[in-house]
Amino acid sequence: MEKIMKTLLPLSFLAIALASPALAQDEARAPDGSPAFGVEPYFGVMGGYHDFDSGNHGLLQTNGSAHGWLAGGYAGVNMPLGPVVVGAEANGAKGFQDIDWEYGVTGHVGLRAGDSGMIFARAGYQWIEGKRGFGNDRNEIYGMGVEVGPKDIGLGGLTTNAGVRLRLAVDTFDVFQSIRPSVGLTMHF
């Protein structure tokens, strides 16, 4: 038994020594080189157009249809979980025409796409301050969108792996009472 132990003990140490490099390998990575698991803060600027259906309540208790261009920004955090991404975001926008201000919060879930892109769906709560005879309103907001990085659209090498991404999104306020398409530039870091 002692002879077996004297043989197994050095072999055990040898096995541990040989396995150590495999255990010390880098963590899992996404296709763009960022960690597959972690926390990714971001911020961005956006522009869009918000158009309310004339049959809506809230902003549209008066006759007519509220609508207006928007310019704003957003900030949030993504938490990649392998191919799935979950996160939270705050937004704010200055409106023109019938909308004075919009601001809100959303949570989102998405799937990584391409080298550095993401397809996502989101839901949250939005406050809208109207003007020109349209009142204020607050309600749920739902939407979906896509983000694409430089490599995904043929501009590889333009920014670093975690750099600027183009965002295309569409949202609806109070379950299909409005439509809000938007375009944004998102900076991940």
Predicted regions and their residues:
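Gram-negative bacterial Sec-dependent N-terminal signal peptides
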Residues: 4-24
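Gram-negative outer-membrane beta-barrel domains
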Residues: 21-189
